[in-house]
Regions:
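Formylglycine-dependent sulfatase
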Residues: 1-187
């Protein structure tokens, strides 16, 4: 979304060894040219400092859920006390209310970490369901049964394909469903 290019074309092909090249054209730069104020608060994870933003406060790397550090526009790192989702939301609202020219159009990128693993709740909710067990609902998984296997066979790629899965991500009995749906070798990690 930032450049409108696929990763192989924008040069950022992985999150561990690459550094985003901020000199290329980006959506925030185009918005600035069109008269918009631009800001980003939260997860950046591009190993470079944001360009094309009038204001930014970003997390170093993945960031931490609790008492996270933020890299500020002056390159100082500031530790904030609290839960990351609340902090990002508060910082975003603060910029909307006090940090921008209300007479100008704006685009604010609010990048929450909570949609990324490990999913950790606010501390007050950490033990809320500690002693409870929940069954997986019958409709938890999609019902595209048969479609992946048919597509793989039609494309003649089934013979060269392995499905790699992590048991922490699948409930009991999923191995047999995966094997039945794909008819392929399964590699358990």
């Amino acid at each position: 979304m930032l450049t409108g290019k696929h990763s192989h074309a924008n040069g950022f092909t992985d999150n561990t060894t690459c550094v985003f090249d901020g000199s290329q054209q980006t959506l925030p730069k185009l918005l600035q040219t069109a008269g918009y104020q631009t800001a980003i608060v939260g997860k950046w994870h591009l190993e470079s400092m944001p360009t094309g933003f009038d204001y930014w406060e970003i997390l170093p790397g993945q960031g931490d859920y609790y008492n996270p550090d933020f890299i500020m526009m002056n390159n100082d790192t500031v530790r904030e006390k609290g839960y990351l989702t609340n902090i990002i939301t508060d910082k975003s609202i603060d910029w909307l209310e006090k940090g921008r020219d209300k007479e100008q159009p704006f685009c604010l990128f609010i990048h929450h970490k909570a949609i990324h693993r490990d999913w950790l709740p606010e501390l007050k909710y950490l033990t809320l369901y500690e002693d409870k067990e929940f069954s997986m609902p019958d409709n938890f998984y999609d019902d595209y049964e048969g479609r992946p296997a048919a597509a793989a066979q039609t494309m003649s790629i089934a013979k060269d394909m392995d499905i790699i899965y992590d048991t922490k991500m699948y409930r009991e009995g999923m191995k047999s469903r995966l094997k039945k749906a794909y008819g392929l070798s399964l590699i358990h990690i």
